[in-house]
Amino acid sequence: MRKEVKLGDILDYEQPNLYIVRNSNYDKTFDIPVLTAGQSFILGYTNEKENIFKAKENPVIIFDDFTTASKYVDFDFKIKSSAMKILKAREGIDIKYVYYAMQNIKFDNQLHKRYWISEYSKIKLLIPDIKIQEKIVKELDLVIKVLDYKKKQIKLFDELIKSQFVDYAIFKNLEVA
């Protein structure tokens, strides 16, 4: 059985101020990722040890309050700015199911303003029983895993084609731009 609910009725949010990184001296050798909900997602890594959000134990969605971009996070992290919300699932809700559902929401975010409280949290979704949510997540995870594998294959084939072209051009004394 499915029920129609508002996002704000199934997700709690936390202001991220406690988890904001204090310096931006990032280094790949550091352990803790610094996140943004935008395109880049992982901005770098910090060696700061205090006030780390523990998403490895309880996954969350980070939600950019201005762009409405969101990312599913299941590892410990710090964040870059307070322009996001950390969304947590309430009991009986699979956070990853909600994340997948949010990726399909069409939303006009053209104005420069915060959206979660005023508008986005009021968007309604059909939510099935938790067992069905978990089954859907399992299926979608598998599809995404296959897609990621296929993308890697395409990249490797593209590199192979380029290298074959270069080899051919060298063999035939052609110029390669």
What residue ranges belong to the model's regions?
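Non-catalytic DNA-recognition/assembly elements of restriction-modification systems
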Residues: 1-19, 24-40, 124-137, 149-177
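A specific heptad-register position in long alpha-helical coiled-coils used by two-component signaling proteins
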Residues: 141-144
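DNA target-recognition domains and sequence-specific DNA-contacting regions of bacterial/archaeal
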Residues: 5-125
